[in-house]
C-alpha cells in the first residue's frame, strides 16, 4: 500500500492565495462600481430604473462571490490544519 503525502505549507499558502483572490475581486469590484457611478447619473427614466435593477444584481453577485471565496479559503485552511493535527496524532501513536 502506498502512502499519501501532503505538503502542508503549500496547502496553507494556497489558502492564503485564495484569501488574496477574494481581496482582489473586492478591489476590482470597487473600481468597477466607481466607473459605473459616473455612468448611472446619466441614465434617467426607464433606462435608469432598468440600470439600477441590473446594478443591484451585479452588486449582490459580487458580494456573494467574494463571500464564497473567503469561505472556501477558510474551509481549506481549517481542513488543512485538521489534517495536520490528525497526521501528528497518528504519527505519535507510532513513535514518529
Swiss-Prot record:
The organism's place on the tree of life at top rank: Bacteria
Main subcellular location: secreted
Gene3D superfamilies tied to this protein: ESAT-6-like
Subcellular location, record wording: Secreted
A Pfam family matched in the record: WXG100
Keyword Secreted on entry: yes
InterPro entries tied to this protein: ESAT-6-like_sf, T7SS_ESAT-6-like
GO cellular component annotations of the record: extracellular region; protein-containing complex
Keyword Secreted recorded: yes
Keyword tags: Secreted
Domain notes: In the heterotetrameric form, EsxS adopts a long helical conformation that pairs with a second EsxS monomer in an antiparallel manner that allows the N- and C-termini of two EsxS subunits to interact with an EsxR subunit at each end of the EsxS dimer thus creating a molecule with four-helix bundles at its extremities.
Quaternary state and interactors: Forms a tight complex with EsxS. Exists in heterodimeric and heterotetrameric forms.
Similarity remark: Belongs to the WXG100 family. ESAT-6 subfamily.
Protein name: ESAT-6-like protein EsxR
Natural source organism: Mycobacterium tuberculosis (strain ATCC 25618 / H37Rv)
Amino acid at each position: 500500500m502506498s502512502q499519501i503525502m501532503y505538503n502542508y505549507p503549500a496547502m496553507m499558502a494556497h489558502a492564503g492565495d485564495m484569501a488574496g483572490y477574494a481581496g482582489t475581486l473586492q478591489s476590482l469590484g470597487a473600481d468597477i462600481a466607481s466607473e459605473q457611478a459616473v455612468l448611472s447619473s446619466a441614465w434617467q427614466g426607464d433606462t435608469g430604473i432598468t440600470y439600477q435593477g441590473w446594478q443591484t444584481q451585479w452588486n449582490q453577485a459580487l458580494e456573494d462571490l467574494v463571500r464564497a471565496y473567503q469561505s472556501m479559503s477558510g474551509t481549506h485552511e481549517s481542513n488543512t490544519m485538521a489534517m495536520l493535527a490528525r497526521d501528528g496524532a497518528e504519527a505519535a501513536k507510532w513513535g514518529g
